[in-house]
Structures are given as structure tokens and as C-alpha cells.
From Swiss-Prot:
Heterodimer of LeuC and LeuD. One of its GO terms (molecular function) is 3-isopropylmalate dehydratase activity. This is 3-isopropylmalate dehydratase small subunit. It comes from the Bacteria. It comes from Brachyspira hyodysenteriae (strain ATCC 49526 / WA1). InterPro entries: Aconitase/3IPM_dehydase_swvl (IPR015928), AconitaseA/IPMdHydase_ssu_swvl (IPR000573), IPMI_Swivel (IPR033940), LeuD (IPR050075), LeuD/DmdB_bac (IPR011824), LeuD_type2/HacB/DmdB (IPR011827). Catalyzes the isomerization between 2-isopropylmalate and 3-isopropylmalate, via the formation of 2-isopropylmaleate. Keywords: Amino-acid biosynthesis, Branched-chain amino acid biosynthesis, Leucine biosynthesis, Lyase. Its EC number is 4.2.1.33. Pathway: Amino-acid biosynthesis; L-leucine biosynthesis; L-leucine from 3-methyl-2-oxobutanoate: step 2/4. SUPFAM superfamilies: LeuD/IlvD-like. Gene3D superfamilies: Aconitase, domain 4 (3.20.19.10). Belongs to the LeuD family. LeuD type 2 subfamily.
Length: 163
């Protein structure tokens, strides 16, 4: 599995209340959530993001409230994966459960800049910064997590395995 896109970069401690503000949690409509993704820290995010783009954060990305609305909003906005130095554990699990690819890589988080073009090889854990001609190494997912992400989430993975 690979992803390629331009980077939307944010800092440390990007919490779920910033990813999708609480005032929008009264909807389960994924497109509506995506329409408000990141608006409190990047009002033009929805206008700038293109399908396949990549989000990069710093330490503790996705901290705060335990809500799966946050990774849903990111995924539905068109982001193909999130790279960060570290993730809040509940955000990490929620992301995998809804099929949003995420990778922890401190070096990539620090060296990648906003608007860099990046290609991610999930099978080998390689993050290539095309703009800077640099490659960073992340720990690839084990096979069972790859299966969940490739199935577009945990529920689909379970449905597909029952054949």
C-alpha cells in the first residue's frame, strides 16, 4: 500500500477538539465532519486539501477527547495518512478502526515541511520526501493492522474475513 500527496503540517498536541470542534459532534454525516476538519487552527484546510494529501503532526497528535469523529473527519477530507512523532493512544486505535493509515516517525515529523510532496510505502515503513530528496524509516504495521486499513476499517475487515 502506498500514498502520495502534499503535506499539511501541524505542531505538537493537536487535540481532537481542534481536529473537529465539539459544536459539530451532533452529526454522524462524514462529509459534514470533513467540511469542518481543522477549521479552528487552519480555516483554509478544507479548501487546500486534495484527495491523497498527507497530514503531519508533532508529539501527542490526537490527544484530548475520545471521539472517533476526529479520524473520520481527517479521512473524509481526503487525507490518505497521518504521520506524527507520536499519537494519543485512543486516536491511534480509532484511526486504525476506521481505516485511516497512520505512522509514527519522529524524524519525518521534524524534517518534513508544509507543502512538501511526500510518498509513503506502508509495507516497508518508508516515507520519502520528494521535495527534499530524503527518506525516513518508520515501523511498518503488522499484517493484521494492514488488513484492517486495506479493508477500510475494522468492521469491513471482519465482514470480509467471514467470506
Amino acid at each position: 500500500m502506498k500514498a502520495k500527496g502534499f503535506v499539511h503540517k501541524y505542531g505538537d498536541n493537536v487535540d481532537t477538539d481542534v481536529i473537529i470542534p465539539a459544536r459539530y459532534l451532533n452529526t454522524a454525516n462524514h462529509k459534514e465532519l470533513a467540511a469542518h476538519c481543522m477549521e479552528d487552527i487552519d480555516k483554509d484546510f478544507v479548501k487546500k486539501v486534495k484527495t491523497g494529501d498527507i497530514m503531519v503532526g508533532g508529539d501527542n497528535f490526537g490527544c484530548g477527547s475520545s471521539r472517533e469523529h476526529a479520524p473520520i473527519a481527517i479521512k473524509e477530507s481526503g487525507i490518505s495518512c497521518v504521520i506524527a512523532s507520536s499519537f494519543a493512544r485512543i486516536f491511534y486505535r480509532n484511526s486504525i478502526n476506521i481505516g485511516l493509515a497512520i505512522l509514527e516517525c519522529d524524524e519525518a515529523s521534524k524534517k518534513i515541511s508544509d507543502n512538501d510532496e511526500v510518498e509513503v510505502d506502508f509495507d516497508n515503513g518508508l516515507i520519502k520526501n520528494i521535495t527534499k530528496n530524503e527518506t525516513y524509516k518508520a515501523e511498518p504495521f503488522p499484517e493484521f493492522i494492514k488488513k484492517i486499513i486495506n479493508s477500510n476499517g475494522l468492521l469491513n475487515s471482519i465482514k470480509n474475513s467471514k467470506g
